[in-house]
Amino acid sequence: MANEVCFRTLDRSDAPWKIDEYRKFGGYKMLEKILREKTPPAEIIEQVKVSNLRGRGGAGFNTARKWRSCKAAPGNRRFVLCNGDEGDPGAFMDRSIMEGNPHAVLEGMIIGA
């Protein structure tokens, strides 16, 4: 399944905003591993490339390619943004993850940072 990681804890809890609920299903384990092992950013990007993770927009942009270009950008200050805009009427693809699995979004953002 292409989105197994994104959706494995979606709607498995009555209180998805609670960190303990997310952790019950293995949430934040990957972040803890990356921090504990001091995984270099290039290795994280390579793992994302191998996973073929893609953006949820219409173009399905390759996430590793995006992260690689951000890492190579000049300057010392960088920011991580989460674009949850759904411009199409009735579109709820981002909203469903942000409401049903908000900690997965946060964990991904932290890893990407």
Give the residues covered by each predicted segment.
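Feature of Fe-S/electron-transfer and energy-metabolism proteins
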Residues: M1-A113
